[in-house]
């Protein structure tokens, strides 16, 4: 299972520029660690999925960021599942990880087609099978 996530910096850390205070530096590092860990995404246990650490690109937060630019996080992860046919759902923990996040749009592409599910706070469950 391949996963891609794009999250605006404002929703993840409350700002979209290079950190200007020690607190912002810590907040940015924490957000990167949470996204890297992959703990915000839990596949159905029956599928037996594992993933190496995700790849996280934090764009717009370094010293070279354009003033007034847009900062965001792009995350990719590849899960390997022992029983992919049993991958019926996901639990998305982004609301717990990022308290200002209000909505997550999940685009799902499977062998049986494509669909979209919208999660509004506090929803966390995504159904993958029809």
PLM-predicted stretches and their roles:
Residues 1-130:
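N-terminal soluble domains immediately following signal/targeting peptides that reside
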């Amino acid at each position: 299972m391949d996963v891609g996530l794009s999250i605006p910096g404002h929703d993840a850390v409350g700002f979209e520029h290079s950190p200007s205070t020690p607190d912002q530096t810590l907040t940015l590092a924490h957000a990167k660690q949470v996204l890297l860990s992959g703990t915000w995404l839990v596949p159905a246990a029956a599928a037996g999925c594992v993933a190496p650490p995700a790849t996280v690109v934090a764009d717009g937060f370094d010293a070279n960021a354009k003033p007034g630019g847009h900062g965001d996080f792009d995350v990719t992860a590849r899960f390997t599942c022992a029983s992919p046919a049993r991958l019926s759902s996901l639990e998305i923990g982004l609301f717990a990880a990022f308290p200002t996040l209000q909505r997550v749009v999940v685009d799902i592409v499977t062998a049986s087609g494509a669909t979209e599910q919208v999660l509004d706070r506090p929803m966390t469950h995504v159904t993958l099978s029809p």
